[in-house]
Swiss-Prot record:
Part of the 50S ribosomal subunit. PROSITE patterns: RIBOSOMAL_L24 (PS01108). The keyword Ribonucleoprotein applies. One of two assembly initiator proteins, it binds directly to the 5'-end of the 23S rRNA, where it nucleates assembly of the 50S subunit. Signal peptide: none annotated. GO terms for cellular component: ribonucleoprotein complex; ribosome. GO terms for biological process: translation. Pfam families: KOW (PF00467), ribosomal_L24 (PF17136). It comes from the Bacteria. It comes from Sulfurovum sp. (strain NBC37-1). Keywords: Ribonucleoprotein, Ribosomal protein, RNA-binding, rRNA-binding. This is Large ribosomal subunit protein uL24. Belongs to the universal ribosomal protein uL24 family.
């Protein structure tokens, strides 16, 4: 049975655990199978980008990583 989340895309949330504790941001994506959310500006990680036809150089880019749903709480905007 699928878990129903009270947090939806576009909600303002605060991180309550981890390195980004206390930060607030907008939910960009909800990942029900992983029971996680992606929050704008929180839990940033460097991702390697392979060279391709469009991007000959490749390189690195910052990207938001998922945060478990139990580590965020909804706040009023």
């Amino acid at each position: 049975m699928a878990t129903k989340f009270k947090i939806k895309k576009g909600d303002q949330v605060m991180v309550i655990a981890g390195d980004d504790k206390g930060k607030t941001g907008e939910v960009l994506q909800v990942l029900p199978k992983k029971e996680a959310v992606i929050v704008a500006g929180c839990k940033m990680a460097k991702k390697a980008i392979k060279p391709s036809e469009q991007n000959k150089e490749g390189g690195f880019a910052n990207a938001e990583m998922p945060i478990h749903i139990s580590n965020v709480k909804k706040v009023e905007a």
